[in-house]
Amino acid sequence: MHSYIVEGGYKIGGQITASGNKNAALPCILAALLTDEEVILENIPNINDVKVVLDILNDIGADIAREGNTLKIKVLNIVKTEIDSSFTDLIRASILLLGPFVSRFGKIDMALPGGDVIGKRRLDTHFYGLCKLGAKLSTKDRRIVLKANKLVGAEMFLDEASVTATENIIMAAVLAEGNTVIMNAACEPHVQDLCNMLNSMGANILGIGSNVLEIKGVKKLSGTVFRIGADFMQVGSLISLAALTGGELEIKKADPQHFRLIRHVYSRLGINFEYDRENVYVRNKQELKVKLDFGGHIPKIDDGPWPAFPTDLMSIIVVTATQVEGTVLVFEKMFESRMFFVDKLIKMGARIVLCDPHRVVVTGKSSLKGNVLSSPDVRAGMSLLIAAFVAEGRSEIQNVYQIERGYEDVVNKLINLGAKIKKVKSQ
């Protein structure tokens, strides 16, 4: 186990290139299972979750070569359809094995997935969609067995716009016989990346970026070369970090077309940034003050399925609000345990009221003091790291494996931006 030792009080700024989106990289890597030809993926972040997925592919017999942020994957055949629970325990995204396996190999046997502790994540929508296509499901001893002799396209309305369920159904449907229509589909940028990658392999997916996808099944997919989009969670985290520490920051290759609503939400906290076709610019001397709603009411910031404000930035919004003059209600609608990390911010001196599992009221500006903190999940971990940079004195962030599940080369990238941080073995 390792920790970060952080010295607070320094400006974070300079120039950085956005990493690839973890939530796009994982399904795109697993989509390589759908062809026996070579798939080349560019801009793949070097993070723990990617390493676990590659370990799974190695274990089943895939050929993988990595050079920097480029992956070459070829899956001529596999040696088994049973996935070791030592892998699935580590990563929630292992659920994305279902679609590719049942589509190309006709069977998968895997344990229920692990991952974050931010709340319950239903699997019902995955099973509904895959079974509508003709798969047969059985469960025993916390293991999932999914089989299909043949998949046939179907029309379906998802009971929730689940990102991973949508991705699983897409990956199963592209090689199914006939047409599939998915209504109430997720349309996040990472879902769009997966669809665009599959189309570059010969799939026929219409409606990309909308909540209705039409998939015309094809008999075979080819190899491809595809570049993963930027990680807008990393970009959002860096915007907060620069603004709260008074730094000036340029984030290159940030895919800012996805930042319209994110920009609006940040502006309600007094954080303003600019962007052009590729880059995001955060200026120093931000006026960090809550903008009240009409009539002088306390503003509410909430999340929802895309294009609403992304749930993965809600933890970042909480720590940001501690450094902004005024009061704001943060309403996490999607996960009932995401807000439980705020006790650690309160320990540092933040003025936060946890109203219930979904809502917190934050009043700023608070003077934070360095402390010893443990990262409960990837996004809360980054929020605590931001708090440590804002705080007076030294902080220790423990369980940094969680942060490194989603953020690439954290220490070196932050040092290059002027941060005082080092990684050490935990006592």
UniProtKB/Swiss-Prot annotation:
Which residues make up the binding site for phosphoenolpyruvate?
22-23
* Keywords annotated in UniProt: Cell cycle, Cell division, Cell shape, Cell wall biogenesis/degradation, Cytoplasm, Peptidoglycan synthesis, Transferase
UniProt GO BP = cell division; cell wall organization; peptidoglycan biosynthetic process; regulation of cell shape; UDP-N-acetylgalactosamine biosynthetic process
Question: What's an example GO cellular component term for this entry?
Answer: cytosol
Query: For this UniProt entry, what is the primary localization, expressed as one broad class?
Result: cytoplasm
According to its UniProt record, the EC number is 2.5.1.7
Catalytic activity annotated for this protein?
Answer: phosphoenolpyruvate + UDP-N-acetyl-alpha-D-glucosamine = UDP-N-acetyl-3-O-(1-carboxyvinyl)-alpha-D-glucosamine + phosphate
The annotated active site, in chain numbering, is 116 (proton donor)
Q: In which pathway does it act?
A: Cell wall biogenesis; peptidoglycan biosynthesis
- SUPFAM superfamilies membership: EPT/RTPC-like
Show the GO MF annotations: UDP-N-acetylglucosamine 1-carboxyvinyltransferase activity
Annotated InterPro entries = Enolpyruvate_Tfrase_dom, Enolpyruvate_Tfrase_sf, MurA_subfamily, RNA3'P_cycl/enolpyr_Trfase_a/b, UDP_GlcNAc_COvinyl_MurA
Question: What functional role does this protein have?
Answer: Cell wall formation. Adds enolpyruvyl to UDP-N-acetylglucosamine.
Family label: Belongs to the EPSP synthase family. MurA subfamily.
Against NCBIfam families, the record matches this protein to: murA, PRK09369.1
**Official protein name in the record:** UDP-N-acetylglucosamine 1-carboxyvinyltransferase
Instruction: Tell me what organism the protein belongs to.
Output: Borreliella burgdorferi (strain ATCC 35210 / DSM 4680 / CIP 102532 / B31) (Borrelia burgdorferi)
